[in-house]
Amino acid sequence: MIRRVLPHGMGRGLLTRRPGTRRGGFSLDWDGKVSEIKKKIKSILPGRSCDLLQDTSHLPPEHSDVVIVGGGVLGLSVAYWLKKLESRRGAIRVLVVERDHTYSQASTGLSVGGICQQFSLPENIQLSLFSASFLRNINEYLAVVDAPPLDLRFNPSGYLLLASEKDAAAMESNVKVQRQEGAKVSLMSPDQLRNKFPWINTEGVALASYGMEDEGWFDPWCLLQGLRRKVQSLGVLFCQGEVTRFVSSSQRMLTTDDKAVVLKRIHEVHVKMDRSLEYQPVECAIVINAAGAWSAQIAALAGVGEGPPGTLQGTKLPVEPRKRYVYVWHCPQGPGLETPLVADTSGAYFRREGLGSNYLGGRSPTEQEEPDPANLEVDHDFFQDKVWPHLALRVPAFETLKVQSAWAGYYDYNTFDQNGVVGPHPLVVNMYFATGFSGHGLQQAPGIGRAVAEMVLKGRFQTIDLSPFLFTRFYLGEKIQENNII
């Protein structure tokens, strides 16, 4: 396929001819012709790269009903449910734009892969309960003909949350809500905790909650690849590139109290191709912002937050990249194979990794300790000073641990209330959000994808009401408080 692709600032690209076009009684193999011409030019100009003609078969289509910005688990989940819920096969054309198909800096692949239902908000509990069902039946949802079944390597060891005296009442209240929503969670006194987990030091622990079903951890990379494989089989298109611009129309409106607002509708997405100064315009009806830690930049391209401060028009998407470290250590005398993911009163956490006496964990920094998110370099002193002392206090065997490796990843951190943003923007009427989950987006992705697809296709949330997660709460100042974010 040859398509004229335009540098920034020029008009639309044109599709000139499809491969195999019949002409004069024979078939023209255009991809083959391009390859042949490139070889000839290279032979004439040895040692020089050939950019005179570009094979553009990797380009996005000129039109897509839905453009999803971000090809991580959240974006792929939205794509999956859009195709799953469409009225007939092929009714909706979906394009996923991902700037890095290696996912080297994507939050999904750098996650510790945990799933639990021990939240304080009913919506978060419901989302994680559905995700547990989705993961448990993964091959019913994501099976592809003639492809091997998925093995998420789910470890159902549960989550163990520890509370100090001042947080014990809140933990009891949270567990009551969790049980009402159907989660299987038990409360444990310090004595019960010592009996079940003799390796733990209960100093400073007044109460613990323990997830007995559908909690643990899984392979996030396997889920990502399984979703990608499935949506491709359903006809979802992919493009490696970066969204650099939206072309929109505007309409000035008056509210019921006679305040002027400007409604925008995106008509075209400009996708800058990988390692190129060229872009491809894509006409669309809907844009899904699932760009994770960089979703605020995508929102700003659409004009979100451009108005006067204190107005709905001037309300920005409060999501930014926050760097989080994960450390892996070895400790032969450490807790055994049935060790849950432990969340300490200090904020430190850990779990086992495999069968070889290895563990991984970390701790979210305070606001004053937040590292520079410009790169993914690891601060090993943070472990020595801020993580290890808490681990060694809670599990005395960890006094002799030896750090083996470490990595860093990004949270799509919602600075407003650390909860997700789901659904349409009130003024950019065809931009929908699936972002800002501040570390629990992976485990809730199946439910979030379904909710966004419902809103796009049906105009409302149908299975789980996620109205508290709408963008308008930022303008109204209505924080939703989730007490259990690790």
From Swiss-Prot:
InterPro entries: FAD-dep_OxRdtase, FAD/NAD-bd_sf
Subunit structure as annotated in this protein's UniProt entry: Associates with components of the mitochondrial respiratory chain complex I.
Phylogenetic placement of the source organism: Eukaryota, Metazoa, Chordata, Craniata, Vertebrata
Disulphide-bonded residues: none
Organism expressing this protein natively: Homo sapiens
Alphabetically ordered keywords of this record: Disease variant, Electron transport, FAD, Flavoprotein, Membrane, Mitochondrion, Mitochondrion inner membrane, Oxidoreductase, Primary mitochondrial disease, Respiratory chain, Transmembrane, Transmembrane helix, Transport
Protein task: Required for the assembly of the mitochondrial membrane respiratory chain NADH dehydrogenase (Complex I). Involved in mid-late stages of complex I assembly.
GO cellular component: cytoplasm; mitochondrial inner membrane; mitochondrion
A Pfam family per the record: DAO
Localisation per UniProt entry: Mitochondrion inner membrane
Protein name: FAD-dependent oxidoreductase domain-containing protein 1
Domain of life, source organism: Eukaryota
Disease: Mitochondrial complex I deficiency, nuclear type 19: A form of mitochondrial complex I deficiency, the most common biochemical signature of mitochondrial disorders, a group of highly heterogeneous conditions characterized by defective oxidative phosphorylation, which collectively affects 1 in 5-10000 live births. Clinical disorders have variable severity, ranging from lethal neonatal disease to adult-onset neurodegenerative disorders.
Database matches in SUPFAM superfamilies: FAD/NAD(P)-binding domain
Gene3D superfamilies: D-Amino Acid Oxidase, subunit A, domain 2 (3.30.9.10), FAD/NAD(P)-binding domain (3.50.50.60)
GO BP: mitochondrial respiratory chain complex I assembly
Keyword Mitochondrion: yes
Positions of transmembrane segments: 62-82
UniProt topology in membrane: Single-pass membrane protein
Gene: FOXRED1
Outcome following mutation: Y359F: No effect. Able to restore complex I assembly when expressed in cells lacking FOXRED1
GO molecular function: oxidoreductase activity
Outcome reported for the amino acid change (mutating Y410 to A/F): No effect. Able to restore complex I assembly when expressed in cells lacking FOXRED1
The protein's Enzyme Commission number: 1.-.-.-
Cofactor(s) listed in the protein's UniProt record: FAD
Outcome of substituting Y359A: Not able to restore complex I assembly when expressed in cells lacking FOXRED1
Keyword DNA damage among UniProt keywords: no
